Regions:
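Acidic, contiguous N-terminal accessory segments
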Residues: 2-222
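Feature activates predominantly on carbohydrate-active enzymes
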Residues: 156-158, 163-342
Length: 342
């Protein structure tokens, strides 16, 4: 009850500065808002009476619940300290400071920055009324505690932990977010967490940042991922990238790619082009070297290792004898007949 009361007081203080911009009943106004009651977000109708306590659902999810930070996923494994201080931020003026001494990682950080900003912009892609201009400045500082200048490589020994602090500057007109990590992967996870602490308030049409945060986080498991079988069901490069985006959002780090099997062989092997020529579902459903490299790089930027699973040539489908009978131990027809006789 005490925590809910503190949340309620913080919300009321935040709302007092925003009432002048709201006119209930205008076209395209949000009809419903939310209140935090017993650690749950309950919907209420926005009226002249409730406008002072109503908050948007994203803001309610940020502040309400048993966890100190409701929108961060997965839940941090270490310290989580927050104060319910919301700051209207201008996402067009966010600045970044990356470790410039690690020159081989700069392109990865630049790509991570662009993805971070695109994630924030996606909150308002479908809104009818554009967000209000203005807001406070946010500076994101990333510190990597390593002097080794090399392209990051994710192994079972990689330290993916990070510490994150967000603090408002004096005067309340800006905030600074500091990430400290021992590897690119930990720093990237910290950047992902910051993106989860910025929500779009569709009632006040502003981006809001939880501006007083301290988080220490590290994954419980070294191998966290999914398996996708594209030998039985072909997925386009675009679809695979969309899957990698989803993995990155929840800090999973492994894409186990089952790329070939008896159903199809969509993998380009330059020394044996007949494999994908006769083994793929169609000429357009082939993963070339360039496409695979593109997916591997796309995953690296997002802190994901791409692990390819290759089935041996004998498990390629029945069209392989047309390509090169010498590469086949037993055809699928003979294999099926053998099992039928057993």
């Amino acid at each position: 009850m005490e925590r809910n009361f503190v949340i309620f007081c913080a919300i009321v203080i935040f709302l007092l500065g925003s009432f002048s911009s709201l006119v209930v009943g205008e076209e395209y106004d949000v009809v419903y808002g939310y209140e935090c009651q017993q650690s749950k977000c309950l919907r209420i109708e926005i009226t002249e009476k409730t406008i002072e306590t109503a908050i948007s659902l994203p803001v309610c999810r940020l502040l309400c619940g048993d966890s100190p930070v409701g929108t961060v996923w997965p839940k941090p494994t270490g310290i989580m300290r927050t104060e319910n201080i919301l700051l209207h931020v201008d996402i067009t003026t966010i600045t970044f400071q990356f470790p410039t001494k690690l020159t081989k990682q700069l392109s990865l950080w630049e790509a991570s920055k662009e993805r971070f900003l695109q994630q924030l912009k996606s909150h308002t892609e479908d809104v009818i009324v554009a967000p209000k201009p203005g807001g406070s400045n946010l500076t994101v500082v990333v510190e990597i505690n390593s002097e080794i200048d090399e392209l990051p490589r994710l192994t079972l020994d990689t330290d993916e932990s990070y510490n994150l602090t967000i603090s408002p500057l004096k005067g309340g007109g800006a905030a600074i977010a500091k990430i400290s990590a021992n590897s690119y992967f930990g720093g990237r996870h910290g950047l992902e967490t910051i993106s989860q602490l910025i929500v779009y308030d569709d009632i006040r049409r502003e981006y809001q940042l939880l501006a007083k945060v301290e988080i220490e986080d590290a994954p419980k498991y070294k191998w966290r991922g999914i398996l996708l079988d594209t030998s039985r069901h072909f997925y386009s490069v675009k679809s695979i990238k969309r899957t990698l985006d989803a993995l990155a959002m929840v800090k999973l780090n492994t894409f186990h790619w089952h790329i070939t099997d008896s159903q199809s062989f969509p993998l380009e092997i330059k020394s044996h082009p007949e494999l994908h020529r006769f083994g793929a579902y169609s000429p357009s459903k082939v993963y070339t070297h360039d496409k695979i490299s593109e997916i591997v790089q796309y995953g690296l930027i997002r802190g994901i290792r791409v692990v390819l699973l290759f089935e041996n040539n004998p498990r390629v489908g029945e069209n392989l004898p047309l390509a090169n009978p010498n590469l086949l131990i037993a055809s699928i027809r003979e294999y099926s007949q053998c099992h039928a006789n057993i």
